[in-house]
């Protein structure tokens, strides 16, 4: 559960309505894989991830990034039940994929950076603060199965 004020919820949903999920998702996952290269081990089937340009131009990275942000978008519709919303994904990432839950936090922080880059002055400190709460809540929900 994420505790957001009415103003914070409005800020999050207003900005999210302008997000190009495909573009932002691909860039977010791509940046995660470049900045934190150890995360690439979960994506060995994606082909060439040898350079930053290879990662950022990789169609499988872009497609999976879109999928990740589509799930995040679903979470924004259920901020009061993130654990329930992400229960199956938490189980998958814990039991089958064995993803370090810290990676969820890293991904959330990269998403905030990408949103800041895309929205510039519109991504005010207040909007960032609200998004930091949301990505922390999503990361905690995804890590829930690990506890």
From Swiss-Prot:
Gene Ontology BP annotations: hydrogen peroxide catabolic process
Tell me the residues on which Phosphothreonine occurs: 13
Domain of life according to the entry: Eukaryota
Residues that the record marks as modified (N-acetylvaline) are: 2
**Which PANTHER family would you find in this protein's record?**
HEMOGLOBIN FAMILY MEMBER, HEMOGLOBIN SUBUNIT BETA
What functional role does this protein have? Involved in oxygen transport from the lung to the various peripheral tissues.
What is the protein's name according to its record? Answer: Hemoglobin subunit beta
Gene behind the chain: HBB
């Amino acid at each position: 559960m994420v505790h957001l004020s009415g103003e914070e919820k409005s800020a999050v949903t207003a900005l999210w309505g302008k997000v190009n999920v495909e573009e932002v998702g691909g860039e977010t996952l791509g940046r995660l894989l470049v900045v934190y290269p150890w995360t690439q081990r979960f994506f060995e089937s994606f082909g060439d991830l040898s350079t930053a340009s290879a990662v950022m131009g990789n169609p499988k990275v872009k497609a999976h990034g879109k999928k990740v942000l589509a799930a995040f978008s679903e979470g924004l519709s259920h901020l009061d039940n993130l654990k329930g919303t992400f229960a199956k994904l938490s189980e998958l990432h814990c039991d089958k994929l064995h993803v370090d839950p810290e990676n969820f936090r890293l991904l959330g922080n990269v998403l905030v950076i990408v949103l800041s880059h895309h929205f510039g002055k519109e991504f005010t400190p207040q909007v960032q603060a609200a998004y930091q709460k949301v990505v922390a809540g999503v990361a905690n929900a995804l890590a829930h199965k690990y506890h």
